[in-house]
């Protein structure tokens, strides 16, 4: 049995660990809530863009935009969204499993240090790596979007996809691979935007397409909106990934805190037993000394 001094030292260490994990759990919960609110805040933008694209689609034929041009897929371009830090449970490991299962040639643009380290460690083709703060400012994500669009237009990659941990609920984050480019059609873009807007884009009052005037012409505006759609889509998924990251970290820290509490109880019991044994031993020694005298 360990000495009471060693057990006291372990109890102190576990108490400190429990305090740290509890603080990290609270911080992660706060950040998760903010990330969810930020993701929901993008709904009005998606709604308005869906209305505009619906109005444009009725006025022009399918635009001949490079984003709508399909070609033979030789190299996939994948935006991998991971966390910068660990202590997030299996969040990153689940994403890396999806990457490992990709057998076709692919080049990666990575958001998050953990992803960049994995791509380098496994000797995959890394185009660039980026860092995005917890605020997930649109300007930060726009840099990533413009970089990947450039790779697509120059023929470096034949598709652009994004792999991120989709937020389902506090306990569930699902690795999801979403195609971004080339776009299948304007109608599919509208359907996706309406889905993100909660299905309200088509029926909101005062949303008459006839009130919209497009300058210089409808086709020019449509071609300008498609890159904005790609930027917005990437921004939305990075926000979603941040919510997943903070949620996974909150759950991991809660589990660690609960385990520390259980361990603290076991150590306290062990300490009491050791202390009781030491007292009993002292009593026996005193009694033995009295009998011998």
Language model features by range: what are they?
Residues 1-293:
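C-terminal beta-strand-loop-alpha-helix "lid" module of Rossmann-like NAD(P)-dependent dehydrogenases
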């Amino acid at each position: 049995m360990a000495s009471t001094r060693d057990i006291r030292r372990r109890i102190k260490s576990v108490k400190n660990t429990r305090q740290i994990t509890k603080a990290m759990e609270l911080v992660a919960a706060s950040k998760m809530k903010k990330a969810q609110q930020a993701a929901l805040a993008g709904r009005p933008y998606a709604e308005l863009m869906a209305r505009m694209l619906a109005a444009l689609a009725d006025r022009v034929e399918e635009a001949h935009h490079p984003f709508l041009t399909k070609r033979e897929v030789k190299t996939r371009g994948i935006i991998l969204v991971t966390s910068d830090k660990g202590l997030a449970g299996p969040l990153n490991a689940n994403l890396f499993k999806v990457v490992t299962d990709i057998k076709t040639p692919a080049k990666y643009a990575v958001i998050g240090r953990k992803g960049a380290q994995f791509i380098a460690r496994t000797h995959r083709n890394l185009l660039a790596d980026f860092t995005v703060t917890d605020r997930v400012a649109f300007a930060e994500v726009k840099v990533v979007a413009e970089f990947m669009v450039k790779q697509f237009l120059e023929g470096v990659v034949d598709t652009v996809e994004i792999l991120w941990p989709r937020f389902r609920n506090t306990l569930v984050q699902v690795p999801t691979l979403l195609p971004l480019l080339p776009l299948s059609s304007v109608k599919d873009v509208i359907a996706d935007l309406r889905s993100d807007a909660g299905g309200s884009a088509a029926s909101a009052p005062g949303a008459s397409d006839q009130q919209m005037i497009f300058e210089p012409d409808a086709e020019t505006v449509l071609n300008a909106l498609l890159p904005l759609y790609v930027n917005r889509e990437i921004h939305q998924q990075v926000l979603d990934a941040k919510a997943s990251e903070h949620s996974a970290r909150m759950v991991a820290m809660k589990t660690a805190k609960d385990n520390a509490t259980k361990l603290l109880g076991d150590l306290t019991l062990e300490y009491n037993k050791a202390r009781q044994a030491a007292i009993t031993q002292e009593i026996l020694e005193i009694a033995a000394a009295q009998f011998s005298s």
